[in-house]
Regions:
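Juxtamembrane "helix-exit" motif on the non-cytosolic side of transmembrane helices
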Residues: 36-47, 73-76, 99-110
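Cytoplasmic-side transmembrane-helix entry/capping segments in multi-pass membrane proteins
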Residues: 81-92, 144-152
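N-terminal membrane topogenic signal
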Residues: 6-29, 56-57, 80-82
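Structural signature of hydrophobic alpha-helical transmembrane segments
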Residues: 50-64, 119-129
Length: 369
């Protein structure tokens, strides 16, 4: 009920609601962080865990608990509806009872399969701070942060981050078994002799060509469109909308992109940089932000370019497939041309995809009547 009351609502300073909802969010993330500390072998991402400073994470958690508690009290004072403050303080109490920011971590063996709870927490905090700020400073359209459908997209965001370990495990095993025969040491050494920056450009290009091909299949083959339609069903574009994706499509795309990367043997640091760029660009290109790229919009994929891909306007159907380099669409004749700067409407023509994460995961599997 607390989340339902938020949808499409305009939040105004001075009402106490903003403080209440921020308090609940920070308290919930802090509690999840405590659980991740308790069960790191099952709830944290090995690669991410190796990169961050644990003491810094503890400090962030402590600050989050302080801010959450303070805003929860403010909610009690300023808002006639005390529910948010009560929920926040309940979550804070549980988090502290479980050890709070000082929770101890015992020695452990990493599980082969894990839930990316730490990845969800850190990415949600970072993306919210960066992209909500961008959308409010230079918005394309005036719309609420908690616009209609945000709950569905947040569910997708949560699940996609949580299952990252299982998806990567499945993709790695499939690719190594299916394409191990194609690995050739001489070819890998040739690629690794390129400069670091040249490898980065090459991996982006190779990955985008694979994604372009898969993306066209998702659109032009009816069976695959039923899965991909989930991603296109968002009628409002912002940084969170890009998370809306069917698990089957997510896994297939990961396998497709990983295959040439595995075969060509790029340097690990190049792959790490590629992953960062992919994550950032995927979110940026869905943002509700009026960012001017000038002539670069013909080279790289921009929010404007990708918004056209999500448009339900007739001129935009099955266009702008590329994920990184817009020139791929111009070369293959699938770029939107001669249109005004931004599309008018988004979503699936006919609006036949149901709302809700569970319904959307089940939708492609339903037999047409």
């Amino acid at each position: 009920m607390l989340l339902k009351n938020l949808e499409g609502g305009q939040l105004r300073f001075g009402e106490g609601r903003i403080s209440g909802y921020i308090a609940v969010s920070l308290a919930a993330l802090s509690l999840l962080g405590v659980l991740a500390f308790h069960f790191p072998e099952y709830l944290t991402t090995p690669e991410l865990r190796a990169a961050y400073d644990v003491e810094l994470i503890r400090l962030i958690m402590f600050i989050a608990l302080i801010i959450s508690g303070s805003l929860g009290l403010l909610n009690f004072v300023r808002n006639t509806n005390k529910r948010a403050g009560l929920v926040a303080w309940s979550l804070i109490t549980i988090a502290i009872a479980l050890g709070g920011h000082r929770v101890e971590v015992s020695d452990f063996e990493q599980s082969s399969a894990y839930l990316g709870l730490d990845w969800f927490i850190l990415d949600l905090l970072g993306s919210t701070l960066i992209f909500v700020f961008i959308e409010k400073i230079i918005p394309h359209r005036k719309q609420a942060i908690l616009r209609p459908e945000w709950q569905t997209d947040l569910h997708h965001f949560f699940v996609n981050h949580l299952i990252v370990g299982f998806v990567l495990l499945a993709a790695n095993q499939f690719v190594s078994n299916a394409f191990g025969w194609a690995v050739e040491r001489g070819s890998q050494e040739w690629v690794q002799n390129f400069s670091w920056f040249s490898q980065l450009l090459l991996v982006l290009l190779v990955a985008d060509l694979v994604q372009y091909a898969l993306h066209r299949v998702y659109h032009e083959v009816p069976f695959f469109w039923r899965f991909h339609a989930i991603h296109h069903s968002a009628k409002t574009m912002d940084w969170l909308a890009g998370s809306r994706q069917h698990i089957a499509e997510l896994t297939l795309t990961r396998c497709g992109v990983l295959a040439p990367i595995f075969i060509l043997g790029f340097d690990k640091s190049v792959i790490d940089a590629y992953i960062i760029i992919v994550g950032f660009q995927a979110v940026l290109n869905h943002t509700n932000a009026q960012i001017k790229f000038g002539w670069l919009k013909y080279i790289i994929v921009t929010p404007q370019f990708h918004h056209w891909h999500h448009s339900s306007d007739k001129a935009a159907i099955d266009r702008n497939y590329a994920a990184h380099f817009a020139f791929i669409d111009y070369i293959f004749g699938t770029a939107v041309r001669g249109q005004k700067e931004w599309p008018e409407a988004y979503g699936v023509v006919g609006d036949y995809v149901p709302e809700g994460w569970i319904k959307q995961q089940a939708f492609p599997l339903k037999v047409k009547s």
